[in-house]
Each structure stands twice: as C-alpha cells, then as structure tokens.
Amino acid sequence: MSTTVPPEIEEHTRTLRALLHRWGYAYYVLDAPEVSDAIYDQHYRELVDLESRYPELVSPDSPTRRVGERPASAFVSVTHRVPMFSLENAFSQAELEKWGERLLRAIGPGLEFICELKIDGSATALSYEDGVLVRGATRGDGVEGEEITQNLRTIRAIPLKLLGGEVPAVLEVRGEAFIPRDEFERINQERQAAGEKLFANPRNACAGTLRQLDSRVVASRRLGFFAYTAHYGRAESQWEALAELESHGFRVNPHRSLCRDLAEVRTFCEHWENHRHELPYDTDGVVVKVNAFDHQREVGFTSKFPRWAIAFKYPAEEKSTVVEAIAVQVGRTGALTPVAELQPVAVAGTTVSRATLHNQDRIESLDVRVGDTVIIRKAGEIIPEVVRVIGELRPPEAVPYVFPQTCPECGTAVVRAPGEAAVRCPNPRCPALIRGKLGHWCAALEIDGIGDKLIARLVSLGLVHTVADLYELSAEQLAGLERLGARSAAKIVEQLDRSHRQPWSRVLYGLGLRHIGASVSVELARAFASADALARADLAAIASLYGFGEELARSVVEWFAQAENRALLERLKAHGLQLAGGGRAAQSSALAGLTFVITGTLPTLSREECTALIESHGGKVTSSVSSRTSYVVAGEKAGSKLARAQDLKVAVLDEEQLRALIETREMP
C-alpha cells in the first residue's frame, strides 16, 4: 500500500467492499435483496471512484473486480470460452482524452478508434459451432455465467443459424440484450394490472426477463439484441468484426463511427449525449475501442479491464433531496464509512434513499449536516452520489456533524494515520471485521443459508472467529440458535459440506487476498495447481503470468508470508477444503519449463487457441518479452514485442515451427 493513500480512504474502501459483497450475494445468489438497487449502485460508484483515484486500493475481493452477477442455483453454470471483461469508465471528456493520449503514446501513428453506443441492457455470450447456436449465457462473474440458451432462442434478433456461405467452425459472439422503451411500458402496465411489482427501468426488466425459468415468459416480451464483438472470427479489426457479424445475420447497432483522432471521438460522444433520447432504447454512454486487433493485443489487459477500450458515460442526472440522518458503518477492514440517509428521490429511473459520504474528510469538505438539502447525482446514470449542499436551504437548527471517536461496533477508540483519510477501528477482533470476512467467504464459496443475520449471531455468541470455524459448527449448535430450528441447521451443515467440493480457485478467491478477484483467482489456480505451489512461487513467477504484474504478485507473496494465514490454510485443509486442483491438464510435457510470448496474427490459431495449445503441453505464456522468455511466437503484423525479442536475441517461431517444436522438442 502506497503511503500516499490516506488511511481513512483505505479503510472506507474496505467498508464499501464488505457492504457490496453482502448486498450482491443477497440479490444475485439468494434472490432476496436487502437494499434497493439505488443504494447498491450508490455505494458501488463510490468504490469505483476511490479505486480509480487510488489504484493501490484495488483489492482481489472488491466487487469492482467482478464483471457481473453470480449464477443463481436455478440455472446451470457454464464457463465462458473467452472471459467477459468489464470496461473502465470515463465520466468526463478529460478522462476520455487522457485514456486516448496514453494509447497514442503506446502505439504511435496509425491508431484508429471505433465508437459504438453503449446499450443499457444485459451482456450476453453466444456460442456457435459449425454455424449453429449451441449455447447462450449471461455474463455472470466474467468467468462463469448462467446458461439461458432457451430464453435467448426466443429473441428474433439472435440468429439460430449463421448466414453466409463461409462460417467459422467456432464463433463466440458477445452482445447486449435489451428491452425497448415502449415494450418496457407495456410490460409494466401488464404487471400493474396483475398487482405485481413494477420494474424500475428497462435494464432491470431485461435482466429479470432473461432469468425467467419459463422461456414462454421471455417469448412474450419483445427483447432486442445488438451484437458488438466476436472471437475466433477472421476479422483483423473491430470495424471488420462488426461487418462480419452483419454478414452472419446479426443485428449490429448502426450508430457507430470509425474515428481517426480523438477530436472525432469527442464529436461522436457529444452528438449522442444530446440526441440519445431520440432513440427507442436506453443508452448510457459510448464505448470507445482501439480498432485494430493487433493494436489491442499490443496494449493488452489489466487484471480487470482491457486497456484498449473504455466506456464514456453521459453526464449524470441530478436531483435534490434532504438528509434525514447520517449513519456510520464499519467495514471488514475496520474503516468507518458515513452514509447519508435520504428522503427517497427518483434519479434516472431508480429510487435513491441512501448515499455514501465516503469518509470524514468528505463530510467536512461538503459540510453535510442532518436536515440539509443536497444534490444527488447518478454518475453514468447508474450510481448515485451526494454532489453538494444547497446552503441557502439549510435549516437554522442544523449543526456540524461530529465524526465518532470510537468504533460504533466495539467501542474501541478509532485511529487515523497521518496523511490518510480513513478513520479505522484498530481492533482485529472487532465484530464488524469478522463479519465482513465471513460474509465474503460464504459468498465466494456459494454457501446458502448463512446470511448477514446468522453471521452476526454466530459472531456475537463467540462461536465463529475465522472462516475455518464455520466448519466446526454442528447441527446441534445451530439448531439451538433462536428461530433457526433443526431443519434449517441441517441444511446449513449440508451447504458447508457441499462447499468442500468448490474448486481451489474459488477457495483462493474466498480467502480475500488483495487484488485477487474471481477471474484472477481462476488464472492463479490454473498456473499454480495447489496452495503449496502458490506459496512457494516467487514474485517473478507470479508477475510473469499474462495480464498480471508486480502489484498483484506482491499481494500474493505477502499474504502467504503471514504465519496466521498459513495456519488458516492448514485448518481449511484439515476440514477437507480443496486447496489443490484446477491446473490445465497437460497433454504432454514437451514444452515444460519454457516460457512463450505470442504476438501478431497467426495463420490458423487465435491468440486464445495458441495459448491453450502451449499450456496443454506444459508451457507458460506471458504478456511481455524479457530475458527469461524462451520463445516468441510471431505472426503477421507482429509489433514491438518482435522487435524486443530481436534486441534480446530471443528465438522467434512461426506457427508451423511451434507445432514442430511440440512434436520433436527440438528447434526446427
């Protein structure tokens, strides 16, 4: 952690994560929301903002490391062939131009951008084999989603069989399902007549429709679909990929533009910011991408976002409301987070009743007081936040807010390190910290039945202090708790037993290592097939993984260096948790001990297929060329990585030579 990050901000960030994990688990997994969408979105935006301003705060357990909801138990969970990354957001033209200028410096002349409308719906993955739709799924957490093939077949804009004479053997299509505004109004009118709860907005209506168990309900609603990218196709640019999708019978949004500089990008964004309400569907921004795929490969990914794309969000809608109270919540890292409780107000389609105030500094800088009239804004038309106080409307009885000097959970005197913003509870046994860790574990391992209320009771009774303690609970102990009963207790014990079958990657995610989210945990588990192997790995070995870096690697190394964490692993192992498995099964060891970098466009293999080929024979693929690189596999339009390999005298192979190397284990 950088010393430049104020402690109060660090602590507040941890608090936000704990809240969002609990709320997200209740909403997406249990289908039993504890708070409104507006409250969740409000806190999520605050976390996005903090992690954007302080990249050091990005944590493996952060909800922003997810790219969507966890699959519900009513649907079959499927693994995406290609992970569905979320996009970094730009909330101003300045942020957008900063992103573009960074890419211009990295790539140089010839860089082109493509602008596409960001449809406000549900991201969807479609899999075609030999031109036939074989599977459709929700985005889920980006690695796994829910199979909803039957529901997606009812959407007329999705071809069941690809058009065109020449179709690829395998095609992965990504797109956005959505509900037009007029259809949204019709659906809500029907629900109102039937006495059912109304959908808050078209986006929520679309998500709820796609998760219907009865596909006849989906068919009765007029959903639309725009395809926006494809994998394993023949295109060499995003512009060509969209044309290829159209040739196969997909509906592609016609409002797109190929831009040769940032000025053209700005013009496109400004136009649709002013004219978006003329469209028959909702759009909450513009997606800007680097057009050429070789340029996309050159700049690569962060652990969560592609560096070559960004979502420009339209300026937010603002409303005024009154602060009725200011509550302070304690996160699992001990940070105290103040939250403004508001008179409910509708902002951009959802009802906002709570707004985060981030930290003590934020309250003091805004001078927010109970009774104040404040401006609420939904940044990107999704996430609400308090922008400012309307001082002229302040009631005479309003007094400055005094931040608590003791933890509201345990009474310990709070601390604030010099130069940091976070006010923290320093007590490692604070019930709030323990509850947060337990909640994250149960969400990560999909343990049903152990919600916030039960966790609070277990902690208050002293029955549970760590996640390992959960596995020492008996049905008799649980049944003795008020309002639980023998049947519920037995189900909880059964759920804990079932969590033993969760893979090593999910256990790793549940441990809550900093910067190691769900998708990163999958990659780590593939590269290091056991906790012991990961514990033995050094900084360089972890940092060399594709898409990783020193910051992620250091988080892993430091976590495994702590004795209490190693002791926790031993206890979990003794309880039967999966601390091994999940590595890619090797067809041979022909490439064992060799490290590869892939650059350019290969004749027959996509980058993903080439990576899988190398790893299936024991090799390792990294994203950057160094003196430790064994071979660079280069295709057409190979960029700076090829030049780097030549400078370092690293051997360069083409696709044919790579295959020969596998067969003979000798340089051809």
Swiss-Prot record:
BP terms from Gene Ontology: DNA repair; DNA replication
EC number(s) recorded for this UniProt protein: 6.5.1.2
Keyword Transferase (UniProt): no
The keyword Glycoprotein belongs to this UniProt entry's keyword annotation: no
NCBIfam families, per database record: dnlj (TIGR00575), PRK07956.1 (NF005932)
Name of the gene encoding the protein in the UniProt record: ligA
Organism of this sequence: Gloeobacter violaceus (strain ATCC 29082 / PCC 7421)
Molecular function GO terms recorded: DNA binding; DNA ligase (NAD+) activity; metal ion binding
Xref: InterPro entries: BRCT_dom (IPR001357), BRCT_dom_sf (IPR036420), DisA/LigA_HHH (IPR041663), DNA_ligase (IPR001679), DNA_ligase_AS (IPR018239), DNA_ligase_CS (IPR033136), DNAligase_adenylation (IPR013839), DNAligase_N (IPR013840)
Binding site for NAD(+): D37, A38, I39, Y40, D41, S86, L87, E116, R139, E176, K289, K313
Catalytic reactions on record: NAD(+) + (deoxyribonucleotide)n-3'-hydroxyl + 5'-phospho-(deoxyribonucleotide)m = (deoxyribonucleotide)n+m + AMP + beta-nicotinamide D-nucleotide
GO cellular component: cytosol
Protein's name according to its UniProt entry: DNA ligase
Cofactor(s) listed in the protein's UniProt record: Mg(2+); Mn(2+)
Residues reported to bind Zn(2+): C407, C410, C425, C430
Role: DNA ligase that catalyzes the formation of phosphodiester linkages between 5'-phosphoryl and 3'-hydroxyl groups in double-stranded DNA using NAD as a coenzyme and as the energy source for the reaction. It is essential for DNA replication and repair of damaged DNA.
Active site feature: K118 (n6-amp-lysine intermediate)
Gene3D superfamilies: 5' to 3' exonuclease, C-terminal subdomain, 6.20.10.30, BRCT domain, DNA ligase/mRNA capping enzyme, Helix hairpin bin, Nucleic acid-binding proteins
Lineage, broadest ranks: Bacteria, Bacillati, Cyanobacteriota, Cyanophyceae, Gloeobacterales
